């Protein structure tokens, strides 16, 4: 529900550059959370799965600044059962709805690579 509300706000009220800037900022936060120490400090993890780790990091972003800082500072463990894959496609969906075009035609590549282990400084 939270994602749908944000999607509506994003595509109804914002221009293309704002959507692209949001995507870049989201990618930066996901990139910063891409750390071996965060994964190793997590709970409810069976074995490393790149897609799950990405979706878990996305969940962190949906829960606000304090939660993000608690995770990145290792105050709280990342919970392997909590995921939010919908966030990852939010900018492309907003652009698609706003422009009445296919999501595959989304023209923006985010500033940071969000895939697991792309932040080589911390792996």
What label would you give each PLM region?
Residues 1-2:
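Long, charge-rich alpha-helical interaction segments
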Residues 9-81, 88:
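Core of folded catalytic or high-affinity ligand/protein-binding domains
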Residues 68-70, 74-123:
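Basic, alpha-helical nucleic-acid-binding regions used in initiation and control of genome expression
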């Amino acid at each position: 529900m939270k994602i749908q509300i944000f999607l509506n706000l994003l595509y109804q009220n914002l221009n293309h550059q704002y959507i692209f800037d949001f995507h870049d900022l989201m990618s930066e936060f996901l990139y910063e959370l891409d750390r071996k120490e965060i994964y190793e400090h997590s709970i409810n993890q069976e074995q490393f799965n790149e897609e799950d780790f990405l979706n878990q990091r996305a969940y962190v972003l949906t829960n606000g600044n304090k939660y993000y800082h608690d995770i990145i500072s290792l105050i709280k463990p990342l919970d392997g059962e909590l995921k939010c894959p919908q966030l990852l496609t939010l900018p492309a969906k907003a652009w698609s709805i706003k422009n009445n075009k296919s999501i595959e035609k989304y023209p923006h590549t985010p500033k940071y690579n969000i895939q697991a282990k792309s932040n080589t400084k911390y792996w």
